[in-house]
Each structure stands twice: as C-alpha cells, then as structure tokens.
C-alpha cells in the first residue's frame, strides 16, 4: 500500500484557454473509481487562479482513488456556456494539470 505523507497530496488543476475563469458560475470536479463516484467537489472548494481552477485532495481522498480513476470537470459560465472534460488517469501524490480547450 502506498504511503502518503502530509503535504504531498495531489492538486488537480484545470487551465482554461477560451473561458474566463471569473465568468464561471458553477463547476463540479468528479473523480470516479470504476462506476462509482468517489469524490465530488464544487466551485466553492476550488482554488481560483487567473486562468485556472484547482482542487486539492486530502490524504483520505487520495487513498480512496489511488491508481486509475476517471477525472471529470463540468462547468457553466454566467452567460450559460457549458463545458466539460474527462480523462482517465493514474492518481498518485503528484500534481495533475490539464488544459481545457
């Protein structure tokens, strides 16, 4: 079993190229393990940057999805534009940065 040390839990970051982060009204990060939703975080849980949204996982969350998991984000802007992205990836203790077109 992998040991996760304090301060080494991953941050999942989405970088937006064509959407102003300040215009995002709703965002949901979902991490699925198999067919089950293991973690769900909202915009209020996010660290908001100029062109990024980031979510930091706790040690318990990281252990619950360690290995292959599907990471998804869905968002809606204040103008009603919707978008989403999903990717199956290996989640370890490093940081993960994904670009959203």
Predicted segments — roles?
Residues 1-101:
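Contiguous segments within soluble domain cores/interaction surfaces
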């Amino acid at each position: 079993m992998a040991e996760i040390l304090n301060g080494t839990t991953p941050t999942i970051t989405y970088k937006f190229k064509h959407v102003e982060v300040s215009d995002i009204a709703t965002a949901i990060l979902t991490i699925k393990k198999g067919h089950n939703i293991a973690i769900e975080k909202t915009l209020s849980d996010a660290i908001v940057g100029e062109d990024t949204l980031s979510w930091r996982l706790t040690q318990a969350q990281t252990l619950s999805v360690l290995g292959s998991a599907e990471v998804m984000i869905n968002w809606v802007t204040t103008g009603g534009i919707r978008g989403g992205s999903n990717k199956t990836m290996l989640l370890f203790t490093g940081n993960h940065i994904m670009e959203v077109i």
